[in-house]
Design a protein with these regions (language model features):
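Structural signature of nuclease core domains in nucleic-acid processing machines
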Residues: 1-226
């Protein structure tokens, strides 16, 4: 069988794989239908490679497979919506920091940074690239600004700083920080505080984090904000 924690990992991996497939697609191709079709093919590939046919041999396994597929389709819809509502576009997925990775020049303050960020988006404005980092989550963890000020829960912000510092070495372009976010990709819509299932779905589809207060960045993040 597949545990719920394994299902979360599956949805996370499917969302990342979908992102790699749509790199370079024109905006007109980012319809819900087109992105869902790409996700369906991604789910089929991952299901065969990671889970296998044994999952479908009993009722619970078939239920779990349906749930994972539904969660993946919702993640695909949300991803497409994030791109359509603004001007940021994916620059890469599972971007690595440290020796032998995409951003090897990741030493900050004498400390060598090593790790990965799930997704990097870029908004190109003249000769400057505005960057945002996005961490895919299957739980309900949210960035904690107070915690960041106190020196904990700073992982996303450290990656963003290192990304902007290393960007000119990799791309030859100047970079500025635009934001750091969690993207909740789970399928868990318990009615929270009476808001209702649909309200929770809409809320879960948002990028949850902090955005630079530059009007250009706000407009590029969501055209309805400014």
């Amino acid at each position: 069988g597949v545990a719920l924690s394994d299902a979360g990992i599956f949805v996370h991996d499917a969302a990342a794989a979908l992102g790699r497939k749509i790199l370079g697609l024109r905006d007109a191709a980012l319809t819900d239908e087109a992105v869902e079709a790409l996700m369906d093919s991604t789910v089929s590939e991952l299901m065969e490679r990671q889970v296998g046919t044994a999952l479908l041999e009993d009722g619970r396994g078939r239920w779990m497979a349906r749930r994972m597929s539904a969660a993946c389709r919702l993640a695909a819809q949300r991803f497409a919506r994030q791109l359509r509502q603004g001007s940021f576009r994916p620059a890469g997925f599972e971007i690595g920091f440290g020796s032998g990775k995409q951003f090897p020049h990741s030493e900050r303050g004498g400390i060598a940074l090593s790790g990965f960020v799930d997704r990097v988006d870029v908004f190109r404005n003249g000769d400057c690239d505005y960057l945002r980092v996005i961490d895919y989550k299957t739980g309900n963890k949210k960035p904690d600004l107070a915690g960041a000020k106190d020196g904990y829960q700073v992982q996303l912000w450290v990656y963003l700083i290192a990304l902007c510092a290393g960007w000119p070495h990799v791309t030859g372009r100047t970079a500025r920080p635009a934001g750091a976010y969690y993207f909740i990709v789970q399928d868990d819509y318990v009615d929270d505080a009476g808001k209702g299932v649909e309200a929770n779905r809409a809320e879960a589809g948002r990028l949850v984090g902090l955005t630079c207060d530059d009007p250009r960045v706000l407009r590029a993040t969501d055209r309805d904000l400014v």
